[in-house]
Amino acid sequence: MWPFSSKKGVSGFSGSSTAEQVTHGIDATGLTAIVTGASSGIGAETTRVLALRGAHVIMGVRNMVAAKDVKDTILKDIPSAKVDAIELDLSSLDSVKKFASEFNSSGRPLNILINNAGIMACPFKLSKDNIELQFATNHIGHFLLTNLLLDTMKKTTRESKKEGRIVNVASEAHRFAYPEGIRFDKINDQSSYNNWRAYGQSKLANVLHANQLTKHLKEDGVNITANSLHPGTIVTNLFRHNSAVNGLINVIGKLVLKNVQQGAATTCYVALHPQVKGVSGEYFSDSNVYKTTPHGKDVDLAKKLWDFSINLVKQK
């Protein structure tokens, strides 16, 4: 767990800033956003605040019942909110394809894509597509989803003349990936699996994905940015696989952890704030640009991951 700072950075915000505070005065009316993992935690709060600012938010969720509860709660507080949900399981490539097909065929525009869903430090398990579950859910699912939605985002950007933004919710845990960064030849190696390093590997992949995506978007000459971020360590059901961590959180959590309102702040800042206009390929923490690791800025590693991911989704 990483304690956050209440000292304001150059953006004027800090780790104690909330999602409402970092978006104060911003009008997102007319924008459409997708938020994955929106049925709980920072995903639900991100959805609420984007809707509060006027955006039409599509929740990509595994649990449609939980999504309805989130939507009902938001509408109770914000009767004018525009919130919908489409079923999405990021660990299943078929589910990702189905979600993208349904959204793309709806004719809706897409201004903002927030790749937020994730699982943390779970025991070794393979996804339905025979990919290590954390890598499959946290990276590969979002990688495919982004690629499948990109044409719609490009069309929206051209027609609206508004900047599109892709936001990858990574983590400071990317600093604790395997020593080589991404173990391309051992993704599914159970014998050497470490649940925390595998989580770090998947979060490093989120950072590298945004960096390489930035390169492609600039080459295409489209007005879409891609950034990654650390939301801060908060109490969410990410910790459901680790009872020891849950116990520790109950004892000292309030001293070092953000609440959900603070945890969603950096996501909402990167997604909406005018200070971030034109900024791409950066890593943010506490609503400020933050330094990543040498692996996190490794252009060769980013390209290798991109090519590896393309080949992996093609095989499935």
Swiss-Prot record:
Residues binding substrate: 171
Record remark: domains: The N-terminus (1-10) forms an essential portion of the targeting information.
Gene: TIC32
Chief location of this protein within or outside the cell: plastid
Protein name: Short-chain dehydrogenase TIC 32, chloroplastic
Active site (record annotation): 193
One GO CC term on file: chloroplast inner membrane
Stored CDD domains: retinol-DH_like_SDR_c_like
GO molecular function: calmodulin binding; oxidoreductase activity
Sites where the protein binds NADP(+): 37-43, 89-90, 116, 137
Region (Interaction with calmodulin): 298-314
Protein family according to the UniProt entry: Belongs to the short-chain dehydrogenases/reductases (SDR) family.
